[in-house]
Amino acid sequence: MSERVEKLIKEYSKMKVEARCLELQIKDFKGISEDEMIESMNFSQPDGERVQTSNISNKPESIALSYHERMEEANRDWYEYLTRRYLELAEELRFFESAVRSLEGEPGRVLRSMLFDGLTWDEIEAHHHIGRMTVSRQRRAAIAELSKLYDDHENKMVAYLLS
């Protein structure tokens, strides 16, 4: 579990940016345009055997009849994907941030300085009046405590889902 926690610490700022980007994409969602959909359908090749099942033999006519339905489906699928990804990421960040905030003592203060204040190790040394080895020890202690919180959280989720 500590590998997962270390990965979250390492990727925290990137995850925050991705969550904000997804939030804005959802807020400003316009989907693909009619022209983009028609163009993609015009250049697509059918899969499998070619069997003509309608009286329409002209490809542009066929495209004109089905593009709107396909465009709505593509836009709906993409919007659902963005929303699902945002909700997953937001929940992961919510638990991670609350777990970090719940850490007590020097390990919690050091990790919060790293993550939420964006301080470097040198800045943490100066701000907390501690040496580099102490920063390292406090970080490891925070990771160990977070790993326990994640294990407990996971066990509670499993118990809830199985009940």
Residue ranges of each PLM-predicted region?
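N-terminal interaction/assembly modules
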Residues: 1-99, 151-163
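A generic structural signal for ordered secondary structure
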Residues: 23, 109, 135-136
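A short hydrophobic/aromatic micro-motif that marks alpha-helical segments and, especially, helix-coil
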Residues: 31, 119-121, 146
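N-terminal positioning helix adjacent to the helix-turn-helix/winged-helix DNA-binding module
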Residues: 92, 103-107, 138
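Short amphipathic alpha helix immediately N-terminal
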Residues: 102-119
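Helix-turn-helix DNA-binding module
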Residues: 118-134
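DNA-recognition helix of helix-turn-helix
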Residues: 129-149
